[in-house]
Amino acid sequence: MIVTWLPSWLSTDLSLISGFLTWIVVLSWLWRSGWKIQRRYFIEATQKPLTRNAIVWSAGIVGAVFFVAAQMRPGMPGVMTVAMIGALSAYVDARTHRLPNAYTVAMAIGVVLGLVVGGVISPLWQERLLGALIGALIWFVPIALLNRLPGGMGGGDVKLAPVLGALVGSVGLNAAIFALALSFVSAGVAALWKIVVGSAGTKTRVPMGPWMIGAALVGTIAWGVVPDWL
């Protein structure tokens, strides 16, 4: 552990404090300028952009939920940032089939800060850092390869993949593999359902961003917790 003198209660407090500060910072950024980023993507897709109030309120609620859900995770800033900004980015992708680069960068910053906080308060900081690096590769390599195929993954998915892989990889390599598989399975089920109900054809592209972000958050929060309940 980088800081060996921290008692367990202080480690818990630092995790909660870092999560709360992340909640404040993300909301402040969205209120000041972050909310504007999505406007261009919706306008170019001839759709109505989201309002600032809708974005900030939604992000605040999502952040509050994940603040409670992720309080036992040492890398809370990463979880909070991906949850709050990722939810917005996922919605943009679902509507426009594009992932805003600025939101991906913001999530990457949050994941890095989460690794730093986790390194300070976790006795397994070396394993977490190595897991994040390998997790980023586990997610990046297959999605980058699929990007080269006709009709494959989009460029935004390739940029987002290592960010999410690092987040869930810091929990464990098995978690990273599980979350990646979950994202593809979920997207496949969603695509099949749309075909069955007649809302899409066999050549309709499914936006992967929402499934990647959702699967990464599920893997990060639930891995090592849910199996103990079963």
What are these regions (language model features)?
Residues 1-230:
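A membrane-topology feature that recognizes alpha-helical transmembrane segments
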